[in-house]
Amino acid sequence: MANMMVGRLEVQDTPLRDAIWFRRCVSFELAGDRYTVSKAYVHGYHPRENERLRDQAGALVELLHADTAYPPGSVVLEVGCGVGAQTVTLAVQSPEAHFLSVDISADSLAEAEQRIRAAGLTNVRFHQADIFALPFAEESFDHVFVCFVLEHLSRPAEALEIFTRLLKPAGTLTVIEGDHGSTSFFPESDAASRAIQCLVTLQRMVGGNALIGRQLYPLLVEAGLEAVKVSPRMVYVDASRPDLANAFIKKTFTAMVAGVRASAILAGLTDSDTFDAGVRDLYRTAESDGVFCYTFFKGVGIKGRPA
């Protein structure tokens, strides 16, 4: 059985190894007798994915961010800002707050900064950093905001503990995540369900968790936060919302699933005909007699003051 080396870890010739080879963006860290995965983004870093993220942000502004606003003068850390898809909304809705947005990808940060400049915003600074090695002193920020990041981490609980330490007492940590297991649609399709499961499995293979939305409450409590509140944010689409059918079903969710086609086939999770049938059936739910439903989860916790 042929093996390959990824960093310091030898990976056997399995679908996991093939998926790792294909993505070429996975790095490993030894942690005792096991390993964790860092810097693994199952959707990839390419222009179409950046466009999908922008479409997603635009479609979900009201649903996810209507109740997100920070007081004048507050300093907010946005972790994992990516291409700035959420950053612009945050900065617009809290024009007198100061944002420091960080990401590990220099290319993503460059695009995010360009988006901020194009929007004429001046209350955002950017910094390149690893989530698990953030170069900031404890209690440096009034608030921390994290959106669609935990699902890609092999150690989400550790990350939340880091974010909590960076908060000042009485500061808030806001986390937004999806949950692919919440997806339901009509017409029903086993092929579409299997295509979605390919994405869930691939994300698990590289250390992430596409079902993490349902876990936000216990994760935030375990991080030591108080007064934790989690609210489901459901996207429901039928023929009465053709704008959302295009923006969310087609350009956001189905585009996300379709984007892992090559990885899923290479990893042995499906074949091209089955996967393509599933994607077609997902697009089919955007037609006049189709229905689509998906749930995001938004959690907010407060850092307690010292006893």
Question: Can you name each region flagged by the protein language model?
Answer:
Residues 38-58:
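Class I SAM-dependent methyltransferase Rossmann-like catalytic core
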Residues 77, 83-133:
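Class I SAM-dependent methyltransferase SAM/SAH-binding core
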Residues 157-172:
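A short glycine-rich, Lys/Arg-flanked "PGG" loop and its adjoining helix->strand segment in the class I
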Residues 174-242, 251:
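Conserved catalytic/acceptor-binding region of the Class I
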